């Protein structure tokens, strides 16, 4: 399995914000978001091949009881289901962070953190028009999102760049044809720097208050800035 990095930090996003966690970041992604904050795991994937026992040994070096399987897109990694099972067999709480473009296929986890991508994620022309078409065709898979929501404890987390994005989100939720509690929908300001996030935080928080969604910050930027291993 190609692993970009394994590190111990504080969960900075979502309903488990503040929880000490070991992050296992797989390398490789089937999308190319233009604002991606981990291009070394997506646009230009890099990493080392590691076996499941090697990954588990590194996880066990840390005192945390929460593990986050992230990427890139962890659901396209070979042996991801076996890794998830092995992590949970050791008694860890496992969160899988995914864009929800790949069906769960029975994978085990304690929290599915689903982050479907909006129109604002469309890549620029760095990789030419082919990737833009691939990204747009794949970024929103309502049947896949529905399978995750119906089968797992979940949170739906959307990256918001402008107020109009909220209307797009509400349209996506409507197309799921499910009763999604608003407190399980998290809106997060787009930005790879603290300044960018703060610039969007105040109006997004007000939108969350008005619509009943949950606001989520990017605590890791407050604590560590935009750097790897955090």
Region annotations inferred by a language model:
Residues 1-54:
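Canonical Radical SAM [4Fe-4S] cluster-binding loop centered on the CxxxCxxC motif
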Residues 23, 66-68, 155-157:
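Short aromatic/hydrophobic contact patches that present stacked aromatics
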Residues 25, 70-71, 98:
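A secondary-structure boundary/capping signal
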Residues 40, 71, 116:
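Residues that line or immediately flank small-molecule/substrate-binding pockets and catalytic motifs
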Residues 45-72, 76-78:
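Glycine/small-residue-rich loop that forms an oxyanion/phosphate-binding "nest" at active or ligand-binding sites
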Residues 56, 75-230:
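Conserved AdoMet/S-adenosylmethionine-binding subsite of the radical SAM
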């Amino acid at each position: 399995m190609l692993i970009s990095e394994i590190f111990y930090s504080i969960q900075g996003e979502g309903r488990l914000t503040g929880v000490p966690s070991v992050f296992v970041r797989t390398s490789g992604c089937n999308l190319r978001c233009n604002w991606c904050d981990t291009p070394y795991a997506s646009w230009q994937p890099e990493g080392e091949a590691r076996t499941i026992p090697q990954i588990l040994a590194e996880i066990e070096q840390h005192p945390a009881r929460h593990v986050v399987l992230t990427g890139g897109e962890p659901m396209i990694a070979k042996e991801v289901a076996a890794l998830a099972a092995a992590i949970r067999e050791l008694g860890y709480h496992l969160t899988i962070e995914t864009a929800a473009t790949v069906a769960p296929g029975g994978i085990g986890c304690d929290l599915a953190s689903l982050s479907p991508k909006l129109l604002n994620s469309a890549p620029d022309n760095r990789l030419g028009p082919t990737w833009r078409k691939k990204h747009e065709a794949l970024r929103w898979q309502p049947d896949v999102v529905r399978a995750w929501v119906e089968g797992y404890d979940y949170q739906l987390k959307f990256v918001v760049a402008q107020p109009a994005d909220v209307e797009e989100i509400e349209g996506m939720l409507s197309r799921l044809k499910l009763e999604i509690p608003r407190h399980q929908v998290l809106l997060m300001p787009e930005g790879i720097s603290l300044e960018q996030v703060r610039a969007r935080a105040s109006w997004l928080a007000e939108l969350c208050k008005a619509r009943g969604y949950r606001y989520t910050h990017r605590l890791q930027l407050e604590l560590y800035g935009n750097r790897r291993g955090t």
